[in-house]
Amino acid sequence: MKQVKLLDCTLRDGGYVNDWEFGHDNIVTIFERLISAGVDILEVGFLDDRRTFDRNRTIMPTTQCADQIFGKLDKGNTMIVAMIDYGTCDISNLSPCSESYIDGIRVIFKKHVMHEAIQFCHEVKKLGYKVFAQAVSITSYSDRELLDLVDLVNDLEPYAMSLVDTYGLLHQDNLLHYFQLLNYNLKPSIAIGYHSHNNFQLAYSNSMEVLREPADRTVLVDATLYGMGKSAGNLPIELISMYMNTVFGRNFNVSQMLEAIDISIMPFFRKSPWGYNLFFYISASNNCHPNYVRFLMDKHTLSLKSINTILDAIEPEKKLLYDKDYIETLYRRYQSTECNDEADIQALHLCTPMPRMVPPNGFPSDLHNYHAAVLLLY
């Protein structure tokens, strides 16, 4: 039987806005308001052993650090999860789940390391955690590649596998195509998740489509308070929770979410606004990594038409894997072919010189009279 669930990832994805420095009081406020709102799953941040522990930040080197921040807070019936970007947190930094405040680990990974990442997920599962296999940049997968990943995931049998639209590229038809590939081929016990970004202003409508799609399994969507998140932002949780209350009979307390937004989120928005803008539209419309757009815009020498021309020349396999040297080469090539003035300069050298024009009575020795004489010529 289908179940629909809501996952909040404000303290993790929202951290891209403020380098995860929410401040301890805000961390507690956001956590407690979301628990009171009744969210099903709450993601409390990144586990990243390259970072040192800071109680004011939601990026932590170990699960024990997460325990220090959240351990005394009542999580009620909500599942508490953290995220690992595969390769940034060694398995030794995870305590057994039975000794941790955290219930589940979401592991994000790119296509080229999916075999290694799934093996890491097996190790996480052995520690007793609920595991979420998060396939980032889902649009980089062909159908065959995605089905190969599904085979690996079926063998893992995680709590969930998620479609991660990292750069907000998906429209309804291709989103549902990916969803159906998973729905028809994943074991029924594995939930399907969807993580959206708002580059095309489609996070809300796409999430509604995923929730409405027939499925005999659990389907969950990610959202954040006021859409706080990387680049164009995420699905606003206050919108999708209202929709889920109306259509699916859920009972999320939206007022608690609005309180958290007012108290803890709006100060960050006023300082560093997120949301749809032209920059993220250009990256999404060209199906490319936003750093390519940023690189070209920072040159301050190109029109939007020229930027689109260069982005269109990026090879498909390079589009979502940012390569600074590669885009520099494309930029220089464009400049040399489209903006090369050498031919025009040579043409000017070949032009017949214009005859020297001299006033009828010669050039005056007085400078002011000279200017006057020149004006008379025109």
Feature roles, as predicted:
Residues M1-Y378:
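Catalytic cores and adjacent flexible loops of soluble metabolic enzymes
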